[in-house]
């Protein structure tokens, strides 16, 4: 097995085996398109990249994670450190079967440089071991695992982290997972559906439905009606789904919403409601539109009276 790996401080243009960190001050956009310095969270960016060749098969591994600075001892920073560490442990390699033991970092989980390096190495090793078996049977394929967890948007009341997980383990195409998590600054609590008044679930679904119509529309095929929309989607009858969620079969997304610069963001994962060709159906509902449907927690995050 041929391995390429280099650990230490490296320039961004290095293609194989790099572990590097840089201090980044993220900025938040203002209403006029300008930007002001963020006053909530400063992060370091840690990236692991490695490749391996196993006879006729190949492995690519990339883990890229933002992490609060070591000197930040706020409850928000502590909450995010634990969240980032768990995310790296969960996504260090493609899902290769139920028999795969989860990776658990035995060192200091607040040391993201060492955690990312250990997780990256473990992922390359496990993918290589499986590909060795496949190569021995004459298969030519590759495993790609690309995970990113980045600071997406922040205010003095909340911070949103975005994660993107791109995996390929052979076959016609890979898989892409997008998730985001919003954290309340004052206590580091992770927020999700509790930002909305779910007693108004039918109105929330109605807003999402209108956004999905726009998402699936094209220049020569505008989707206006519910009937047109559901001809594009791929839905299943689920006996466990409450009756009030079954209007034309559209449920709330399995992934909780998050707060971004231009509104509340909703995202369905691949195959959740649509065929692969439609990707990840996603909707951003502007804050002035979603405001009447917010819970007390959601209104607090957006500083709404």
Protein language model regions, located:
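Compositionally biased intrinsically disordered regions enriched in Thr/Gly
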Residues: 24-305
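Core hydrophobic alpha-helical transmembrane segments of single-pass membrane proteins
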Residues: 11-16
């Amino acid at each position: 097995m041929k391995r390429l790996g280099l650990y230490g401080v490296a320039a961004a243009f290095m293609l194989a085996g790099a572990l590097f960190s840089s201090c980044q001050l993220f900025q938040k956009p203002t209403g006029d398109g300008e930007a002001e310095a963020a006053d909530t969270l400063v992060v370091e960016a840690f990236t692991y990249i490695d490749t391996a060749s196993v006879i006729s098969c190949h492995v690519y591994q990339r883990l890229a994670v933002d992490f609060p600075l070591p000197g930040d001892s706020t409850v928000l920073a502590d909450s995010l450190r634990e969240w980032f560490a768990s995310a790296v442990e969960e996504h260090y390699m493609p899902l290769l079967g139920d028999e795969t033991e989860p990776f658990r970092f035995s060192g200091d989980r607040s040391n993201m440089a060492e955690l990312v390096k250990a997780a990256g190495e473990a992922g390359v090793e496990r993918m290589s071991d499986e590909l060795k078996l496949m190569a021995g049977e004459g298969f030519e394929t590759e495993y790609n695992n690309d995970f990113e967890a980045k600071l997406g948007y922040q205010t003095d009341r909340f911070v949103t982290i975005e994660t993107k997980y791109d995996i390929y383990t052979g076959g016609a195409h890979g898989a892409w997972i997008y998730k985001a998590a919003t954290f309340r600054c004052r206590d580091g609590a992770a927020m999700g559906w509790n930002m909305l008044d779910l007693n108004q679930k039918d109105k929330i679904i109605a807003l999402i439905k209108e956004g999905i119509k726009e998402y699936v529309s094209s220049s020569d095929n505008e989707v206006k009606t519910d009937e047109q929309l559901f001809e594009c989607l791929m839905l299943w009858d689920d006996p466990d789904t409450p009756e009030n969620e079954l209007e034309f079969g559209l449920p709330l997304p399995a992934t909780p919403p998050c707060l971004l610069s231009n509104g509340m963001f909703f995202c369905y994962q691949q195959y959740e409601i649509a065929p692969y060709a439609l990707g990840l159906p996603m909707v951003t509902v502007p804050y002035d539109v979603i405001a009447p449907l917010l819970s007390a927690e959601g209104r607090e995050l957006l500083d709404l009276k």
